[in-house]
Amino acid sequence: MRNTFLEFEQPLAELENKIEQLRYVQADSAVDISDEIGRLQQKSQTLAKEIYGKLTPWQTALVARHPQRPYTLDYVREIFTDFHELHGDRMYADDQSIVGGLARFNGQSCMVIGHQKGRDTKERAARNFGMPRPEGYRKAQRLMRLAEKFKLPIFTFVDTPGAYPGIGAEERGQSEAIGHNLYVMAELKVPVIVTIIGEGGSGGALAIAVGNAVLMLQYSTYSVISPEGCASILWRSADKAPEAAEALAITAPRLKDLGLIDRVVNEPIGGAHRDPRVMARLLRRALGDSLRQLQDLTPEQLVEQRLERVLAYGRFQEVRG
């Protein structure tokens, strides 16, 4: 699949096009131009490193939404084995914007739950663009309770612009479903490890993000509102989204400094979508480290530690001049 380039990546796109053209020439010619191709590839890597080394928060938000970025099921295939998907909330329907099921992580049984967007138009519509309805959150809740019953660690993957705001979702209790998930996750007596892999949009993200350890990929985002939504409220114009992104503190390093996440997982040069397998290997290692740190804790200690994390949200220190 050809890479899709964002607006700020245009110099990189032009260089990649030159490399592609030279490959076609080499295939049809007896002239060896492999050295020139290698030189341009090295230049492309250097340029990508420069561009991604100074991303603004708004550019990071664009990378987090990249259409080729790995989704939950991509990581499930690369990191877990024996995945068996479970469906439905046992009350209304099966929401495909949240996927989950039993799997093995490094040979250990576990439960995996995550938001899932789509790759093409048909799948995006079926998965509601990764925006869960109440039945999606209730499905996640059911799987968490099942994991607790069998004493299985839980891995969740967050990637949503937010909970679906449709009339039907509100009628079926969207806010209740999100709120109840927070309550349930806070008291689970098994390890819960959360990873923000793309967009972490508001309560729709938080509903599966109350964990003992919260990891965040380097170019993912996590915020109470999208930059465009914030700009529309404050400045009455979505054009101010870059300024809103700066003020919202949506990036992984800022959130780590604020104590809202525990670990930033570095991505390959150019983002996770440039090399999904390398990204999966890096994430597998980080997940393994987190699980090892939690496995010696008793159920009571797990609950206490998780509650301490949640109650620390919003703490501040007042400094008087």
Swiss-Prot record:
It is found in: Cytoplasm. InterPro entries: Acetyl_CoA_COase_a_su (IPR001095), ClpP/crotonase-like_dom_sf (IPR029045), COA_CT_C (IPR011763). Pathway: Lipid metabolism; malonyl-CoA biosynthesis; malonyl-CoA from acetyl-CoA: step 1/1. One of its GO terms (cellular component) is acetyl-CoA carboxylase complex. Coiled coil: none annotated. Transmembrane segments: none annotated. It catalyses: N(6)-carboxybiotinyl-L-lysyl-[protein] + acetyl-CoA = N(6)-biotinyl-L-lysyl-[protein] + malonyl-CoA. Belongs to the AccA family. Acetyl-CoA carboxylase is a heterohexamer composed of biotin carboxyl carrier protein (AccB), biotin carboxylase (AccC) and two subunits each of ACCase subunit alpha (AccA) and ACCase subunit beta (AccD). This is Acetyl-coenzyme A carboxylase carboxyl transferase subunit alpha. It comes from Bordetella avium (strain 197N).
